[in-house]
């Protein structure tokens, strides 16, 4: 077990070094030798884990995508646990993809660099496509379940709403990143939250009936220990 953990940690270190190089100098600056130097490893050790530069880049793209995904999943779980309205949960999810601070700005730089390379690299394109698909699925699932609980009107198409909201989010992310002075001083930043709120309000127009009942009802008996819960956007209401 310790040896496996060590191997995974080294792979993470290499992926982190790739991301550092992209953030500082761009994707074209990434070489196996520079990655090894940035990670504090020998070239031979890096090549032990990744036979080619393309393998190394693919792993780095998967790693940064997984890190963003983990934060999104945590936002959803937190929304379920605290019974937040679906629109609020989705706003929190979508802001994880927008470069509103230094860390997310670096992530955006890395993911967009890989997305550009993905135009001619099918393996990278698959990672990019999967990340976009999962986001749309999250939004569509929230809309679908919002229809069941009363937060979304019956005639709203979850798939169409997901495409619209994902497009708004991606556009805002690009506008924020383009600001030359960085996210903290960006003139676009003050508009991000109001614009997301306005777009989400078009879809999530109602109030959760279940939450309304729970606030009106007397306290219930505790849940049976061991009962399962499904941490998805739909169960936030």
Identify what each model region corresponds to.
Residues 1, 92-98, 136-137, 141-148, ...:
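C-terminal peripheral helix-coil segments that are non-catalytic and often amphipathic
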Residues 13, 17-59:
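Helix-turn-helix
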Residues 59, 70-107, 158-165, 189, ...:
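Hydrophobic alpha-helical connector segments
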Residues 62-68:
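Short, basic, alpha-helical segments at the C-terminal edge of helix-turn-helix-like DNA-binding modules
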Residues 69, 103-112, 122-149, 160, ...:
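Amphipathic alpha-helical packing segments from all-alpha helical-bundle domains
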Residues 89, 109-110, 144, 154-175, ...:
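Hydrophobic alpha-helical segments that form the core
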Residues 94-102, 109-120, 194-195, 199:
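Helix-loop "lid/cap" segments that line or gate small-molecule binding pockets
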